[in-house]
A protein has these predicted regions:
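Active-site-proximal region of nucleotide-activated glycan assembly enzymes
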Residues: 6, 14-16, 85-148
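An amphipathic, basic-hydrophobic alpha-helix
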Residues: 39-68
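Conserved donor-binding/catalytic loop of nucleotide-activated donor transferases
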Residues: 87, 231-233, 249-258, 278
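Acidic donor-binding loop of glycosyltransferase active sites
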Residues: 66-68, 231-246, 253-254
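A short, well-ordered alpha-helix in the C-terminal region of glycosyltransferases
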Residues: 307-321
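An aromatic- and histidine-rich active-site surface loop
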Residues: 14-18, 66-87
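Donor-nucleotide binding loops and adjacent catalytic segments primarily
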Residues: 1, 10, 14-17, 22-25, ...
C-alpha cells in the first residue's frame, strides 16, 4: 500500500476471520484444506477442496489481473499460487521457518522467487536454491519502535524475566519454570521480576509457587504489550516459533528456547538452532527441560552478565529489522518496478 499498489488478500474461511487484523484490506475467500496427517476420506475431501479452490482462484485472477501473487505458506496459498503460475503471473512464496513448510514445498516449483527468513532453509531442493532470496521474516512495527540497546542489570537492580509460550502459554512451562526460578540462590531470586504468559487453568498454582518463593510475578494468558515487555526483558524463556525468533533477533534479546516438540517437521527446533548457533541464545529440547537443568542454565546466564550481553549482541546481529522492505523490494524487482514508482493500476495479491 505504501508504494501505491492495491493489495488484495486471498484466503480460506479460517483465514478470512483474521482479515480485519490487516486493516481495511480487500479480501476474497476460496476453498482449501490441508492434506497431511489425515485419514483417507479426509484427504480425498481435501484434494477436492484444493481443486475447487484452484478453479475459484483462476476465475478471480482473470478478473483482477494482478502483477504479482505472493504466497505465505499454508494450504490456502496453494490454489492461488498454482493458478497464478499457470496464468503466467509473477509469483513469489515466503517461508517463515528454517524448514520449508509442506505447502511451500508443493509451491516451490511454481515460484519465480522463494523468500526465506533464515540464511539456510532445510528441505529447499537444490534445483530451487537459485531462486531463493534471504529477506528475513517481517516483524511488527511495534517491535522495531520498542527496541533499545541491551543492558544487563548491575548490583542489586531488578532482573526482568519474560516467559512466553505461544498464544495461550505452554502448560509444561507452568510445571518447570516456577520451580526452576524458585530454586535459584537467594541473591538472584530476590531480584527477579517475572512476567509469564500462563494458561488460565494453571494461573493460581503458578502464582502460589512464585509467592512462596518471594518472587514478584505478573501472570496472564495474554499480554497486549509484548513489544514493551520484550524491550525490558533481560532474559526471555519461550518457544521458538518463526515470529518469536524473528522478534528476539530484531530486538536483540538473549533467550532460552524450548521448542515445541510436535511442530511439523520439527521446525521450531531448527528455528531455535539457527539463532543459538549464531550465539543468540540457548536451546533445551523439551525432553531435557527439567526444572533442575533449566535452573542451572538460568543461574549461569544471570551470574555472568557478559554471557547474556554477548548473546544479546549475537541475536541482534542476525536480526533483520527491514524484512518487510526487503520483501517489498523483491516483489517490485520481480515485476520490473525497480524505481518503486507509485501506480494505480498494478496490483499485488497476497495468497
Amino acid at each position: 500500500m505504501g508504494r501505491g499498489y492495491r493489495l488484495v488478500l486471498v484466503t480460506d474461511r479460517r483465514g478470512s476471520a483474521y482479515s480485519g487484523l490487516l486493516g481495511d484490506l480487500e479480501t476474497y475467500r476460496i476453498s482449501a484444506a490441508g492434506i497431511s496427517g489425515r485419514g483417507l476420506t479426509a484427504r480425498i475431501s481435501a484434494v477436492f477442496q484444493l481443486g475447487l479452490g484452484w478453479l475459484q482462484a483462476r476465475r478471480l485472477l482473470k478478473q483482477l489481473r494482478p502483477r504479482a501473487v505472493a504466497g505465505f505458506g499454508g494450504y490456502p496459498s496453494v490454489p492461488t499460487v498454482v493458478a497464478a503460475s499457470q496464468l503466467h503471473c509473477n509469483t513469489i512464496i515466503h517461508e517463515q521457518n528454517a524448514v520449508l513448510g509442506r505447502a511451500n514445498r508443493m509451491l516451490a516449483p511454481y515460484a519465480a522467487r522463494i523468500a526465506t527468513s533464515f540464511d539456510r532453509t532445510d528441505m529447499l531442493r537444490d534445483r530451487d536454491q537459485a531462486r531463493a532470496v534471504h529477506t528475513g521474516n517481517p516483524v511488527r512495527p511495534e517491535i522495531i519502535e520498542a527496541a533499545t540497546p541491551y543492558r544487563m542489570p548491575e548490583g542489586d537492580d531488578p532482573i526482568e524475566i519474560l516467559v512466553t509460550g505461544g498464544s495461550q502459554g505452554a502448560a509444561i512451562f507452568n510445571e518447570i519454570i516456577p520451580p526452576a526460578l524458585a530454586s535459584l540462590p537467594d541473591a538472584l531470586r530476590g531480584r527477579l521480576r517475572v512476567t509469564q504468559q500462563c494458561r488460565g487453568d494453571g494461573l493460581a498454582l503458578v502464582q502460589a509457587v512464585y509467592r512462596e518463593a518471594g518472587i514478584q510475578a505478573e501472570l496472564a494468558p495474554f499480554f497486549s504489550d509484548i513489544p514493551a515487555r520484550l524491550a525490558r526483558a533481560h532474559l526471555v524463556i519461550g518457544r521458538s516459533g518463526a515470529s518469536t525468533v524473528a522478534e528476539l533477533a530484531a530486538m536483540g534479546r538473549p533467550a532460552i528456547m524450548i521448542p515445541y516438540p510436535h511442530a511439523t517437521d520439527n521446525h521450531q527446533r531448527e528455528n531455535a538452532a539457527r539463532l543459538c548457533d549464531a550465539g543468540g541464545g540457548w536451546l533445551i529440547p523439551q525432553e531435557d527441560a527439567t526444572s533442575e537443568a533449566l535452573s542451572a542454565l538460568i543461574r549461569s546466564v544471570l551470574e555472568s552478565p557478559d554471557k547474556a550481553g554477548r548473546a544479546a549482541e549475537c541475536a541482534r546481529r542476525v536480526g533483520v529489522t527491514d524484512a518487510a522492505e526487503r520483501l517489498a523490494d523483491l516483489v517490485c524487482e520481480l515485476i520490473g518496478d525497480n524505481a518503486h514508482m507509485k501506480q494505480e493500476q498494478p496490483k499485488e495479491i497476497t495468497a
